[in-house]
UniProtKB/Swiss-Prot annotation:
Keywords, ordered alphabetically: Disulfide bond, Ion channel impairing toxin, Nematocyst, Potassium channel impairing toxin, Protease inhibitor, Secreted, Serine protease inhibitor, Signal, Toxin, Voltage-gated potassium channel impairing toxin
Cellular localization per UniProt: Secreted; Nematocyst
Marked site (Reactive bond for trypsin) residue numbers: 31-32
Protein name per Swiss-Prot or TrEMBL: U-actitoxin-Avd3k
Principal location listed in the UniProt entry: secreted
Family: Belongs to the venom Kunitz-type family. Sea anemone type 2 potassium channel toxin subfamily.
Maturation-removed propeptide residues: 76-82
Cystine residue pairs: 21-71, 30-54, 46-67
InterPro entries: Kunitz_BPTI, Kunitz_BPTI_sf, Prtase_inh_Kunz-CS, TFPI/VKTCI-like
Source superkingdom: Eukaryota
Length: 82
C-alpha cells in the first residue's frame, strides 16, 4: 500500500499536470450552449466543446489560453526550449 502511494506521488510530480486537467470532458446536465475548452489527455491539447451551463467538472475553461496555462500546454506558436 505504501509503495502504491509513493508511486502515485512520484508520478504526479513527474508529470506535473493539474489533476483537474485529467478529468473527462463533461458537458453538464443543462441545455445552455456555452463554448468552452477542456484538456484532452489523449491528444494532449485543449479542445473546444459546448458546455450545458451546470454541473460538469473542473476540466472546463472559458478560453483556450486559460486551458493551456492551467494544464501546461505549450502553444504551437511558442518557441521550443533547448
Amino acid at each position: 500500500m505504501v509503495f502504491l502511494l509513493c508511486f502515485f506521488l512520484v508520478a504526479d510530480v513527474s508529470y506535473g499536470i493539474n489533476k483537474d486537467c485529467l478529468l473527462p470532458m463533461d458537458v453538464g446536465r443543462c441545455r445552455a450552449r456555452h463554448p468552452r475548452y477542456y484538456y484532452n489527455s489523449s491528444s494532449k491539447r485543449c479542445e473546444k466543446f459546448i458546455y450545458g451551463g451546470c454541473r460538469g467538472n473542473a476540466n472546463n475553461f472559458i478560453t483556450k489560453k486559460e486551458c493551456e496555462k492551467v494544464c501546461g500546454v505549450r502553444s504551437r506558436d511558442s518557441p521550443k526550449e533547448n
